[in-house]
């Protein structure tokens, strides 16, 4: 029931746990595989690679224990602290990830779309992600370039382009979505 912290990721070697986590919410990605569909999970016998924010989310819910390479357990608070030291704006990125997960969405990396996250209603291989999420630092304003970029990106990949930030005063996640419209 554990994953080993290796750099910016947590590796789940136990194949049964890896399959269960992926089946449960499409957490992580299997080493050497792209999008694995739910009905293909039992054929995979590779480790599951979790991003730090995914591992933290699962650890906070008691689904996994994260351990160091020497086997020492890393509690969720310490994992968050490590994340802050390695990833810029880790707390905000995690809050945004958690926000969507808590609403029941499947959240995957949006890197191939030039975004922070791709957000699915059901999961990769089942439906297409209707939304790509880009992180906007809280102290930075929205520029016309951000809006133009968002419109073009959203249109080119047929997804709602969403700017996400966390308000400093309240810690609330705020979203601003752009969809392409033909006039």
Curated annotation (Swiss-Prot):
Q: What EC number is given for this enzyme?
A: 4.6.1.16
Which Pfam families does UniProt cross-reference here? tRNA_int_endo, tRNA_int_endo_N
Mention one GO molecular function. Answer: nucleic acid binding
**May I have one GO cellular component term?**
cytoplasm
Highest taxon listed in the record's lineage: Archaea
User: Reaction(s) catalyzed by this protein?
Assistant: pretRNA = a 3'-half-tRNA molecule with a 5'-OH end + a 5'-half-tRNA molecule with a 2',3'-cyclic phosphate end + an intron with a 2',3'-cyclic phosphate and a 5'-hydroxyl terminus
Q: Which SUPFAM superfamilies match?
A: tRNA-intron endonuclease catalytic domain-like (SSF53032), tRNA-intron endonuclease N-terminal domain-like (SSF55267)
Q: Which InterPro entries match?
A: tRNA_endonuc-like_dom_sf, tRNA_intron_Endo_cat-like_sf, tRNA_intron_Endonuc_cat-like, tRNA_intron_Endonuc_N, tRNA_intron_Endonuc_N_sf, tRNA_splic, tRNA_splic_arch_short
Question: Which residues are annotated as active site?
Answer: 120, 128, 159
**Lyase is among the record's keywords:** yes
Q: Provide a GO biological process annotation.
A: tRNA splicing, via endonucleolytic cleavage and ligation
Which terms are listed as keywords in the entry?
A: Lyase, tRNA processing
Class of enzymatic activity (EC top level): lyase
By sequence similarity, the record places it as follows:
Belongs to the tRNA-intron endonuclease family. Archaeal short subfamily.
Subunit-structure text: Homotetramer; although the tetramer contains four active sites, only two participate in the cleavage. Therefore, it should be considered as a dimer of dimers.
Q: What does this protein do?
A: Endonuclease that removes tRNA introns. Cleaves pre-tRNA at the 5'- and 3'-splice sites to release the intron. The products are an intron and two tRNA half-molecules bearing 2',3' cyclic phosphate and 5'-OH termini. Recognizes a pseudosymmetric substrate in which 2 bulged loops of 3 bases are separated by a stem of 4 bp.
Q: What is this protein called?
A: tRNA-splicing endonuclease
Q: Which organism is it from?
A: Pyrobaculum neutrophilum (strain DSM 2338 / JCM 9278 / NBRC 100436 / V24Sta)
Encoding gene (name): endA
